[in-house]
Design a protein with these regions (language model features):
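Generic detector of low-complexity/intrinsically disordered segments
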Residues: 6, 25, 29-30, 35, ...
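Secretory targeting and sorting signals
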Residues: 1-37
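Extended non-catalytic accessory segments flanking core domains
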Residues: 38-318, 322-345, 429-433, 438-462, ...
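A broad structural signal for short, well-ordered beta-strand segments within beta-sheet-rich domains
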Residues: 31-33, 137, 208, 420-421, ...
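Divalent cation-coordinating acidic motifs and surrounding scaffolds
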Residues: 286-616
Length: 616
């Protein structure tokens, strides 16, 4: 997957404000609104929120809406939350709402206030992106009635509180949208969260399923027994089962005052975490913690796979996340340690996201010899073999990824264990094909690109095919990095089920690779072919179905227990993005996903490597 960059939502808060641990003191800063004494108006928060995702009062001016301040955010989307301490009897109508001030608010937690302003529905990234909107009061005038009030009791969210069903089907008459459907919080998890939008909620002793990040956030699950991984995470098992208990957690306290904790998958966010329930641009529903629990280590450690024996060929794949010469040496060393110590120095390593020698500088450079020399030197320094490499430089700016980086697939191989069969003529635009030589399938160009002129590979990495020989037996390896999921609607989308628009291109890519493997097997029925890399799609996806169509390939991930099937964690969901597939000529194999990155806050890459061992 291609990582998306974003500014730190808390950067403005670092060292900028003085806030008590409970945010109990008023922020003494300039604000566009004034604080004066006033009484409540007739319209209540639950009236504004209504029983759907869109306020029945959107666009209207509201006057003297009363509530108790339950949280203050002085960074990012600045404002505060208020909650009516006198709820109605409708569980579908939230009693809380966010007041967007666009400046550090001059209110404190526990203040009783009245707010006048405009009711708006804010769509992060714009309405066209498909996300659910956040109901808020904008351009406010705020009056403080009293201070030091008791907060409304939090709604406790636990395993029993979360419905098993994730979301309703969208309304066909509304383009598949759910935003105008009446909320059913007792039936659907997304409806439950929507019905609590802006309200004070509490979780206790929550299992951490997504490690803390540079953006001061982590993911927990309120249902740790649902789709549990073997190492304390939550596995994305199917499109119909996206794990409704997942919740993102951030802190409202600036990190300069209270550093955000470091957490790994398998840890626990111990004690109570409490604050308003928000909707986040980068991950759905979010507990904006006024009170943050303590991380209790779970003891998760990076895995190590076994070494191959003398007669086994070990082939690995590793997405090294935009590796380039501008990276510090520590990244090269950590990735090298992963290859040597955690993967036990495989015979062949298919690398994804090797950048060119100028990295993200867009200067026309396409060679990657400097990048690969530094990496292979680091492997030797870590005690590994002196790997040789093969690859094909891409056309400048034609293969997607980070602008200027020209990422590509590359083979490393240990010449003391395996030989590479070089057949010249392969370049960025020339397709390799299959011929018969001495009764065996052979590539016309090795290394060579698979079907590079096919529009399926536009702005995407072209597959790299190479022919190897191990103990006299030829093996064809195809390294892949399919297009990313960028542009897909999120699991929290107001369109349910969400549209996976990026899948169209991956399907075409899978069909292209499948057709190439068919060509190999037509020439040699028992040819030994390994297709591997960052497929950017799940084991239950249509992409995997297209790769394996006709029985020409089978995905090795299914040889693992279900609770071990993941190479990447996104929004707290452990999932398969990287796969290894083999042709029928490889009858027995030993496959492993080596969890050394995805579960940890301190990562060498955002993907876990995978390895397959077999006897050709």
């Amino acid at each position: 997957m291609i990582a998306l960059s974003r500014p730190s939502r808390r950067a403005a808060a670092v060292g900028a404000f003085t806030v008590s641990a409970a945010l109990g003191a008023a922020l003494l800063v300039t604000s566009p609104f004034t604080a004066t004494a006033a009484g409540p108006g007739e319209l209540r928060i639950h009236d504004i929120q209504g029983n759907t995702r869109v306020s029945p009062h959107v666009g209207e001016q509201v006057t003297d809406v009363a509530g108790i301040v339950t949280g203050v955010r002085a960074y990012g989307s600045r404002g505060f939350w208020i909650q009516d301490p006198r709820p109605d009897d409708d569980p579908a109508t939230s009693e809380g709402i966010f007041v967007f001030t666009n400046a550090a608010p001059a209110v404190a937690v526990g203040d009783a206030v009245t707010v006048s302003g405009t009711v708006t529905e804010y769509y992060y990234g714009g309405a066209a992106r498909g996300d659910t909107s956040l109901t808020q009061i904008s351009r406010p005038t705020v009056s403080v009635v009293s201070s030091g009030n008791e907060l409304p009791a939090p709604v406790v969210l636990d395993a029993d509180a979360i419905p098993a069903a994730y979301a309703p089907e969208g309304d066909p008459a509304d383009g598949g949208s759910i935003e105008k459907l009446p909320l059913q919080p007792e039936k659907y998890a997304l409806d439950l969260y929507a019905s609590l939008e802006g309200m004070n909620v509490r979780i206790e002793d929550a299992a951490i399923t997504g490690p803390s990040t540079a953006y001061y956030e982590l993911w927990v699950t309120l249902q740790p027994e649902v789709n549990a991984t073997s190492r304390g995470g939550t596995r994305y098992a199917s499109y119909d089962d996206p794990n409704p208990g997942r919740l993102k957690v951030e802190s409202l306290v600036p990190v300069a005052q209270q550093p955000f904790p470091t957490a790994n998958t398998g840890d626990t966010l111990g004690g109570a975490t409490e604050g308003p329930l928000d909707y986040d641009e980068f991950g759905g529903y979010l507990l904006a913690a006024r009170e943050l629990g303590t991380v209790v280590p779970g003891g998760t450690e990076p895995e190590t796979t076994r070494a191959q024996d003398r007669k086994e060929l070990a082939v690995a794949a590793y997405n090294v996340e935009n590796l380039n010469p501008s990276n510090d040496q520590a990244k090269f060393d950590r990735l090298a340690a992963g290859v040597v110590h955690h993967l036990a120095s495989p015979d062949i390593v298919a690398l994804e996201e090797i950048q060119d020698d100028s990295g993200p500088v867009d200067d026309g450079t396409v060679t990657a010899d400097v990048t690969l020399t530094r990496f292979t030197d680091a492997i030797v320094a870590a005690g590994g073999p002196r790997y040789a490499w093969r690859g094909i430089d891409p056309e400048d700016g034609r293969d997607g990824g980070q602008p200027g980086g020209n990422i590509r697939n590359v083979f490393l191989f240990n010449p003391d264990r395996v030989s590479f069969t070089d057949r010249p003529g392969g370049d960025a635009t020339t397709a390799t094909s299959v011929v018969k030589q001495r009764g065996k399938a052979a590539l016309t160009h090795s290394p060579g690109r698979v079907d590079p002129a096919n529009p399926a590979w536009d702005s995407s990495r072209k597959p790299l095919a190479g022919e190897f020989s191990f103990r006299g037996t030829p093996v064809i390896v195809i390294a892949n990095h399919f297009n990313s999921k960028g542009g897909d609607q999120s699991l929290y989308s107001r369109y349910q089920p969400p549209t996976r628009s990026s899948e169209v291109q991956r399907l075409a890519q899978a069909e292209s690779v499948n057709a190439f493997v068919r060509d190999i097997l037509r020439v040699q029925k028992n040819a030994q072919v390994v297709v591997l890399g960052d497929i950017n799609d799940f084991e239950f996806s249509a992409t995997t179905d297209a790769l394996t169509a006709g029985g020409v390939l089978r995905s090795a991930v299914f040889s693992l227990p279900a609770d071990e099937r993941y190479t990447y964690i996104f929004n707290g969901n452990a999932q398969v993005l990287d796969q290894t597939l083999v042709s029928p000529g490889i009858k027995k194999f030993d496959y492993d996903i080596v969890h050394i990155n995805s579960e940890f806050a301190d990562q060498a890459s955002d993907h876990d490597p995978q390895i397959i061992r077999f006897k050709p």
